[in-house]
Amino acid sequence: KYVEYLISTPINYTCTNLADHLDGEISHDAINDYLRRENHTPHTIWELAKPLINNSKEAYLIVDDSIQNKQYSQKIELVKLQYSGNTHSLVRGIGIVNLVHAHQNDYNPIDYRVYAPSVDGKTKNEHLRDLLRLAFEEKNIQAQTILFDSWYAASENLKYIHRLGKFFVTTLKENRLVSLSKE
């Protein structure tokens, strides 16, 4: 139920909010205990999502990053100051690069990476390429089209997607030049 809650809740991810929506079925303390006890890795997210997706060529992959706001946290090591597209400002939080499988009205997260360059030295663009490589090579995802915002519209990413034989849909920043020739 917790994964379903995360998928359907765009704003308030608290244990208390989930418990309120379960009409007393589960207490917020039980949810908190579960989250402290369990270790949800990208692999476990995939195992939960795999039976739910319609793995067809008509599906899409969506790459999007989000920041889990931790403005009051002083001791969580992954918290850093970073730009939030939601607030259009810098916020203290944990950056996550998400990969979502979309088919018709079904949206299922299938992978994610924590954006922590001080830990793994990777950029968000490198995470995008890693997520896509795993999706197509190891998870055997059949989607042909990848959607992402202009943050990921770097030449290296676009060429990588092209080499995969896939299509992309994105917006480009004003200062980007595009060539329609095959050069």
Task: Please provide the spans of the model-predicted regions.
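Generic hydrophobic, aliphatic-rich segments that mediate packing or membrane embedding
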Residues: 14, 27, 45, 58-61, ...
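Hydrophobic, Leu/Ile/Phe/Ala-enriched alpha-helical segments that form helix-helix packing faces
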Residues: 6, 22, 53, 132-139
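Active-site-proximal, Lys/Arg-enriched surface segment
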Residues: 35-106
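Gly/serine-rich nucleotide phosphate-binding loop at the start of the catalytic core
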Residues: 1-40
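Short, conserved acidic/polar surface loops in the N-terminal third of protein domains
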Residues: 71-77, 109-112, 158-159, 180-181
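A structural signal for short, well-ordered beta-strand segments and their strand-loop junctions
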Residues: 17, 60-63, 109-111, 147, ...
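Electropositive, glycine- and tryptophan-enriched low-complexity nucleic-acid-binding patches
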Residues: 29-33, 84-142
